């Protein structure tokens, strides 16, 4: 887990001290190096996760679109079928009127 921004800033400010002993300077630089490594690792993991989720989202959008089109076609076919049933119905009034 990368350092908190405040902790990172604290280490950088500590390194500005010209009287800082070499051992503490080395330790601070090592902390920054480790922090950078963990930051890059976490960034790469999050990038891969984001790419995977974006691809899944795109697949879901396509699937959803297909389902809506299929439902739309089914509903239209049902409406057409109902209209056809109604138009084929002959009543006694229709026969008497002709």
Curated annotation (Swiss-Prot):
tRNA processing in keyword set: no
Annotated keywords: Coiled coil, Late protein, Viral capsid assembly, Viral release from host cell
Superkingdom in the source lineage: Viruses
Basic and acidic residues composition-biased segments: 77-86
Gene3D superfamilies attached to this UniProt entry: 1.20.5.400
Coiled coil: 40-62
Pfam families xrefs: Scaffolding_pro (PF11418)
Region (Disordered): 77-98
Quaternary data: Homodimer. Interacts non-specifically with DNA; probably binds DNA in the early stages of DNA packaging.
Recorded family membership: Belongs to the phi29likevirus scaffolding protein family.
Function, as annotated: Scaffolding protein involved in the icosahedric procapsid assembly. Coassembles with the capsid proteins to form the procapsid. The scaffolding protein is found within the capsid as a serie of concentric shells. During DNA packaging, the scaffolding protein molecules are released from the procapsid.
Protein name: Capsid assembly scaffolding protein
Natural source organism: Bacillus phage PZA (Bacteriophage PZA)
Name of the gene this protein is made from: 7
């Amino acid at each position: 887990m990368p350092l908190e921004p405040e902790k990172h800033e604290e280490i950088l400010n500590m390194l500005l001290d010209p009287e800082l002993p070499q051992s503490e300077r080395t330790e601070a630089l090592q902390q920054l190096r480790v922090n950078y490594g963990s930051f890059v690792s976490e960034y790469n993991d999050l990038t891969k996760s984001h790419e995977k989720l974006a691809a899944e989202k795109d697949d879901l959008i396509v699937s959803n679109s297909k389902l809506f089109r299929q439902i739309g076609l089914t509903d239209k076919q049902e409406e057409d079928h109902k209209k056809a049933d109604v138009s084929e119905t002959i009543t006694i009034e229709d026969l008497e009127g002709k």
